[in-house]
Design a protein with these regions (language model features):
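A short, Trp-centered hydrophobic/proline-enriched beta-strand micro-motif
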Residues: 120-128, 172
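A structural signal for short hydrophobic beta-strand segments in well-ordered beta-sheet cores
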Residues: 142-145
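Glycine-rich phosphate/cofactor-binding loops in nucleotide/flavin-utilizing enzymes
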Residues: 2, 71, 75-76, 96, ...
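A short core secondary-structure module
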Residues: 154-200
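Internal helix-loop-helix
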Residues: 50-111, 115, 119-120, 162-168, ...
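Glycine-rich beta->alpha junctions and the first turn(s) of the following alpha-helix
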Residues: 5-7, 197-290, 359, 375
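Amphipathic, small/basic residue-rich leader segments at the start of a protein or domain
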Residues: 1-89, 112, 116, 247-249, ...
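C-terminal helix-coil-helix/basic helical segment that borders enzyme active sites and/or dimer interfaces
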Residues: 28-36, 266, 270, 274-277, ...
Length: 384
């Protein structure tokens, strides 16, 4: 299977790998940490990438990009996730907040929000899930009520990543009651510094304060905070979720760790049971399968439309890959010989395993993805 994306993409990959080697320490814990040292590393690294437009290369130059192809942006995602995501929390703004604002924002919203993202200056969080609205997102209860020239937002969000450090929230709220629950939803861009917002950290196995509850107590915003049409939030969110799912290029991290295994084990690699090495080979094939599905979605995004079934198929493939590769790597890592190389490999595998436990739940439970895929396949058959 040939994934050659051309000389420009290859050159960009080499630049990115050199920058990672130069600026990211070996003990960096990735995007899912609130350690002040890791946060400082990520912020500095984003500014380094942004200096030459490499943080958002596919964006227009007026917003901080360099008018490159969607495939160069894909290469950035892959190289960053392969290196344990040294952009830290800013991957959210780059991968899906920015592209969605570019598609649905007013000229004023694009001018306000896109350059800070492309320059690595701002962190976003996502206000979607609620205590009674996770997989069934359309049942959310956070409401935005019209009061003169303002919207008054009241409600609660949960499992919100990066809320303690974010400057802005991409918030979905209900602005009217309609017969279909997907109607009457609206997206708001709200500042996290407003005193009407309270953040309460939730401890988890991903580390303290990665996940949070967020409470909105009569938060007041104007019409300039509305992204897209009032009542059209569900359509906006469908694009958001497609950007988000393909933006998390975990297959690149899985492949990097799998390729590292023979190096870390050295002579011990040949002594592994043949069945274990066969599983390793098959897992590399699964990485390529996930990459192929991701590229299909990228091509659709580049053409201006994404089929929900294809985004769901990618998400199913990459989350199962995450967990299955983590389990395999844990088995392999038990035979790693002592030494610095082996210790770094074991630490990386342990972190990968910890993250992978939530992979089939976060960003849309795998059961919901299977339903979306099944609906898409049935729809294709009925229209054929």
């Amino acid at each position: 299977m040939d994934f050659d994306l051309g000389a420009d993409v290859d050159a960009l990959r080499n630049e990115l790998r050199a920058l990672v080697d130069q600026h990211v320490p070996d003990d960096f814990l990735g995007a899912f940490t609130h350690d002040p040292a890791d946060l400082a590393t990520a912020q500095a690294f984003c500014r380094t990438l942004a200096a030459d437009g490499r943080l958002c290369p596919a964006w227009p130059t007026e917003y901080g990009g360099r008018d490159a192809s969607a495939w160069e942006q894909t290469a950035v995602r892959e190289e960053m996730w392969a290196a344990h995501e040294p952009r830290g929390a800013q991957y959210m703004g780059v991968n899906w907040v920015g592209p969605t604002i570019m598609r649905h924002g007013t000229p004023e919203q694009r001018a306000q929000h896109l350059p800070p993202i492309a320059h690595g200056e701002v962190i976003w969080c996502q206000g979607f899930s609620e205590p009674d609205a996770g997989s069934d997102l359309a049942s959310l209860q956070t409401r935005a009520t019209r009061d003169g020239q303002e919207w008054v937002i009241t409600g609660q969000k949960i499992w919100t990543s990066y809320a303690t450090m974010a400057q802005w929230c991409f918030l979905l709220a209900r602005t009217s009651r309609e017969e279909r629950r997907q109607q009457g939803l609206t997206v708001f861009l709200v500042p996290m510094s407003d005193p009407a917002i309270e953040v309460r950290p939730i401890a988890s196995m991903l580390g303290p304060h990665h996940l949070n509850e967020v409470f909105f107590d009569e938060l007041r915003v104007g019409d300039d905070a509305v992204l897209g049409p009032v009542g059209g939030g569900w359509q906006v969110v469908q694009e958001v979720l497609a950007f988000e799912r393909v933006g998390i290029a975990r297959y690149a991290r899985c492949e990097r760790l799998l390729q590292w295994a023979p190096v870390a084990l050295g002579d011990a690699w040949e002594r592994l049971p043949e069945a274990l090495r066969t599983r390793w080979t098959r897992m590399l094939v699964h990485c390529r399968r996930a990459r192929l599905l991701a590229y299909r979605v990228v091509a659709q995004q580049d053409a201006g439309a994404v089929r929900p079934g294809d985004a769901a198929a990618y998400r199913i493939a990459v989350t199962t890959l995450d967990q299955e590769s983590a389990d395999l790597l844990v088995e392999i890592a038990t035979d790693t010989p002592p030494g610095d190389e082996g210790e770094r490999f074991r630490r990386a595998v342990g972190d990968h395993w910890t993250y992978s436990r939530a992979a089939t739940v976060s960003s849309g439970a795998i059961e919901i993805q299977r339903v979306l895929l099944a609906r898409a396949l049935l729809a294709d058959r009925t229209t054929a």
